[in-house]
Amino acid sequence: MQELASTYRPWDDRRRRARSLAERHSHATEVLRLYLALLDVQEVIYDAALARPPAPERLPSFAIEEALPGVIEVTVAAGPEKLATAAVARFHSADLDDLVGRWLRLEEQPLVDRYLARAATSPVFEALGASFAAAACSGRAPGTACPHCGGPPQLSWSALSGEPLVTGPRYLLCARCHGGWGHTRMTCAGCGETRGSQLPVYGENDRFPQVAVEGCKTCNTYLLHVDLRRDAAAVPLVDELAMTPLDLYARDRGLAKLVPNLVGL
């Protein structure tokens, strides 16, 4: 019998946060417009996976048949023209199984392939839980990897502690299955560096008080960190998408994100 994920449905919270951020940050309007359209399709994919759970080895076929057509449709309707054109061309090419399979194996992919694979498979993982993700995925990220599927961390975030002067625990969120796990503070998620002098933190408190860049001078990588103590309404997965100025700031300092997000930033 398939182990299903928790009964919490994330879609309404993500929609509310995306709309709120789009109203506040004009630079994120285009990205969040596409993301809001994707959320509607991803909720349908999520429900389809719950209703007709595929076997782990059938995930590529399920994604192609049940998920990709809707992802392509909203990408054409709401996405940037370049991405929309590339997505349609890719959907009409051969080797769609490989498009999904390479993401499950964490192999190198063109931007459009990874976007399509992520958009199509993440709601299935969220619906069917950690054991399904572990069985469906074979590739394991270097450095810190998700204990559920082996994927790389997309971001880090701090939970509310319940006490004003107590810092909440730090978590990482998987780019592939969206699972979360605890991780030691002031430790690079890429190489394990712990020396404070090598771990700069950059932020822009006036515009983005809840998000900071967690950098590492040892491996020259970074993650965005979302602090719920600074904004309890934040939804880490959504906030990360809207922080292009912080991404550009980190890149200007020679840092590369551990893994680009859904839209390639």
Regions found by a protein language model. Give the residues of each.
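N-terminal alpha-helical interaction blocks
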Residues: 1-136
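Cys/His-clustered metal-coordination modules, chiefly Zn-binding fingers
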Residues: 129-249
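Juxtamembrane/interfacial segments around transmembrane helices
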Residues: 225, 261-265
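C-terminal membrane-proximal segments flanking the terminal transmembrane helix
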Residues: 246-262
